[in-house]
């Protein structure tokens, strides 16, 4: 999906065609993108789509996170409450997490609307990370950014999206002893840098 709102729309289509409860995973910074189709499509007062939202909780109160996540983190649970979306915390024990997802699926079916499970910092950090992309691409993101810097005219304005691309552009400029005057390092608004 292009963004979280698209994911909710795709999930609704999945439900309409299979009668199975879909799960949409998103970071809480994507909740704003998801809310329009949640309240105007999936809501129990519209098309009653039982939907499980698994939401990564960046900026959770009491945790140390980047500034762009703090406000969203502080209001994540409040936004779900305002939209009358029941929610519970994710568990970092596999058996408990399976039970939590089963709870969410049952409740989504019963209430015929969205239910959320919020995953705080570190909940999914216990296992070994594996890359599904390892070896598929001959060039790293940093190498691609450096080629772009080498190729485009000196006064080109660069807009870098949130996350690693922003950091890599910043540190490449530092390493190359170049200024940042033509760089917009977008640390928030995930998925909207090209707008």
Region spans (language model):
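Thiamine diphosphate
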Residues: 1-194
């Amino acid at each position: 999906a292009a963004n979280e709102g698209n994911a909710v729309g795709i999930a609704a289509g999945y439900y309409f065609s299979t009668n199975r409860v879909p799960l949409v995973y998103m970071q809480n910074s994507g909740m704003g993108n998801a809310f329009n189709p949640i309240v105007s499509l999936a809501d129990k007062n519209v098309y009653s789509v039982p939907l499980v939202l698994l939401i990564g909780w960046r900026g959770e109160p009491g945790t140390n996170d980047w500034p762009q996540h703090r406000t969203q983190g502080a209001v994540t649970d409040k936004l779900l409450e305002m939209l009358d979306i029941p929610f519970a915390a994710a568990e970092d024990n596999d058996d408990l997490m399976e039970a939590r997802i089963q709870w969410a699926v049952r409740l989504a079916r019963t209430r015929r609307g969205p239910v959320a499970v919020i995953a705080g910092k570190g909940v999914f950090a216990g296992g070994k990370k594996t890359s599904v992309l390892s070896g598929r691409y001959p060039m790293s993101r940093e190498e691609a950014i450096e080629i772009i810097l080498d190729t485009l005219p000196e006064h080109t304005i660069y807009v870098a999206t949130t996350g690693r691309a922003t950091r890599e552009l910043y540190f490449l400029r530092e390493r190359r002893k170049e200024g940042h005057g033509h760089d917009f390092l977008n640390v928030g608004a995930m998925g909207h840098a090209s707008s």
